[in-house]
């Protein structure tokens, strides 16, 4: 999974933007190597 400050999703390649627990993810079921996560707030202990 790539971790970037800014992520972009390309729906024509099957990317889906998902927000989970305050972080933004790009998931792709057709091509799992395209997974990305945006740097978000630090985890709570």
Swiss-Prot record:
The keyword Ribosomal protein applies. The keyword Ribonucleoprotein applies. Keywords: Ribonucleoprotein, Ribosomal protein. GO terms for biological process: translation. Pfam families: Ribosomal_L36 (PF00444). Residues 26-45 are annotated as: Disordered. Residues 35-45 have a biased composition (Basic residues). GO terms for cellular component: ribonucleoprotein complex; ribosome. GO terms for molecular function: structural constituent of ribosome. Belongs to the bacterial ribosomal protein bL36 family. This is Large ribosomal subunit protein bL36. It comes from Protochlamydia amoebophila (strain UWE25). The gene is rpmJ.
């Amino acid at each position: 999974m790539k971790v970037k400050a800014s992520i972009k999703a390309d729906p024509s390649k099957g990317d889906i933007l998902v927000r989970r627990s305050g972080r933004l993810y790009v998931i792709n079921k057709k091509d799992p190597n395209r997974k990305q996560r945006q740097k978000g707030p630090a985890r709570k202990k």
